[in-house]
């Protein structure tokens, strides 16, 4: 008996709905980099990238254009200045870190539209994208690898 088929297979309609739902919750480094290069995170753009780690870790290296907003500080009061017209992309260190999940959860619970960056800063770096350092957001320049998918 097939191990792959031992649990059954979803119908094409069920599979389509499942995978569409996954894409509604997550994005990957290549798609985020493309949006950053296209100006989607600039003033007037449609997304805001949030580094959910501590300010010290943000200063050591972060995605260019990201703002530092530790998940532990997110509350109705601290999010008052956030626009409800934006989509917030949360990230943390990556595998083994749930800061991005906690940040995304808190923002969603407060009524914001949000996505989580798959693999966090680890996969961002692994894909060859540059990081900014210090307390300023910085700007992404050309670089990284093209997604092979």
Regions found by a protein language model. Name each.
Residues 58-64, 79, 124:
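Short loop/helix-cap segments at secondary-structure boundaries that form the rim of catalytic
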Residues 67, 84-85, 131-135:
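Short, hinge-like loop/turn segments at secondary-structure boundaries
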Residues 66-73, 111-117:
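Short hydrophobic/aromatic-enriched beta-strand-loop microsegments
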